[in-house]
Amino acid sequence: MATKLFVNLPVKDLGRSKAFFTSLGLDFFGQTDDMASVIVSEHTQVMLLAEPTFASYARNGVADAAAHTEMILVLGVETREQVDALADQAQAAGGEPVGAPRDDGWRYQRGFTDLDGHHWEALCLIEPAS
């Protein structure tokens, strides 16, 4: 059984993308000229790959994330304040908001894009009052 998850994303400018994710408070594990690995958690990393490198692995070409949503990546945090802080940091670093914040009683989330148009969400699951 697999014990780790590696999500691979194409990026146009690895240096700018690394600065964007650093501004969100995320750390990196290793980097080459065409790849940097963002540590999301102990068992999850997002591999930022320069587009030509990503294309060498892709069977069907590279999707234009600015024109099509290829996936939605969700970062789970503990509090509403952390959701707001993460989304605000993303916007301050050049990301764009996606939709309005969602608050339906059991979850609170805000969406944003990274510099390459990949759709991210910051999410807090709210414990019901006892």
Please annotate each region the language model reported:
Residues 20-23, 86-90:
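Short amphipathic alpha-helices in soluble, non-transmembrane regions
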Residues 1-19, 70-75, 126-130:
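N-terminal beta-strand motif that seeds the catalytic metal site of vicinal oxygen chelate
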Residues 37, 87-130:
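Vicinal oxygen chelate
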Residues 63-68:
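Short, flexible turn/loop "capping" segments at secondary-structure junctions
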Residues 16, 80-85:
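Short, conserved charged micro-motifs
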Residues 8-55:
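Core segments of cupin and vicinal oxygen chelate
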Residues 5, 32, 106:
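Exposed loop/turn and edge beta-strand positions of beta-sandwich/beta-sheet ligand-binding modules
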Residues 54-60, 130:
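A short, acidic/glycine-rich surface segment
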